[in-house]
Amino acid sequence: MFTKRHRITLLFNANKAYDRQVVEGVGEYLQASQSEWDIFIEEDFRARIDKIKDWLGDGVIADFDDKQIEQALADVDVPIVGVGGSYHLAESYPPVHYIATDNYALVESAFLHLKEKGVNRFAFYGLPESSGKRWATEREYVFRQLVAEEKYRGVVYQGLETAPENWQHAQNRLADWLQTLPPQTGIIAVTDARARHILQVCEHLHIPVPEKLCVIGIDNEELTRYLSRVALSSVAQGARQMGYQAAKLLHRLLDKEEMPLQRILVPPVRVIERRSTDYRSLTDPAVIQAMHYIRNHACKGIKVDQVLDAVGISRSNLEKRFKEEVGETIHAMIHAEKLEKARSLLISTHLVDQ
């Protein structure tokens, strides 16, 4: 005879890193608390809401950034904990217990990271309002607020939603915008995926990153990191902690604990600094070009002569200018780049030589 176990439904499109981490956080709570829950989640980790009220079980943890899920759960008579982004207006929150990623803290972390690097021009690459991504609208709002408070000039480009049929057009428009930005601008992208668009366009336009433009994303999405030549700095969300807190709160609701409507904001974990914001305040065009060449080719066995050929000036001239701007010789910088690349690979990859 089976003892009574709570049946819990998770409604997430866990084909995305953020959603997967929330689900992992739920699992971590189950392991820590030894809760006897039967978890239902679709085998392909996609949220399906057809006839949802017929199979919800005893409680729900759901992605309330998804408007369709939020609407489908209206008037459902089981305990619900919503998970999603924070809002600057209290009335924007859904009328359920809610665990939120702190959008203000996410954008502020990226902004402060760029400031610490010496950047004093800022831009934001978001998503169009037609995308329906409310968290993107909130992050853009935070960016505008931060640059206004700090008396900086901030530029916003929402861009286009991308699909195979409009990909090249969207990238061309992004290229047009990037070419209007002054050198030494720091760009905060609303997600890592949008940041990758920027890195691709910069590579095509031969805009050196981070020497001329710095780029930072949000999500710390590993897949994006491996798909870009320039390693992307990113703000890691506290998604696992969100899942953990959501499960903990649902447990209290299942135990019939009386409480007011809960809204819990979860801060980001930290900024993961990588090459895309490894900014040095360089002003000499020849040194900027040399640094960019070294960063992209140091591990290909290049020597000082190859750097000179790429820049097109004499050794004595470039060595003098390089020493004045960077404080190192060209040879020393090539060696330092090799060591940094090796260190980064040791930390971040899991490849085994068979």
Regions found by a protein language model. Name each.
Residues 349-354:
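Sequence-specific DNA-binding recognition helix
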Residues 1-59, 69-310, 319, 324, ...:
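Bacterial carbohydrate/catabolite-sensing allosteric modules
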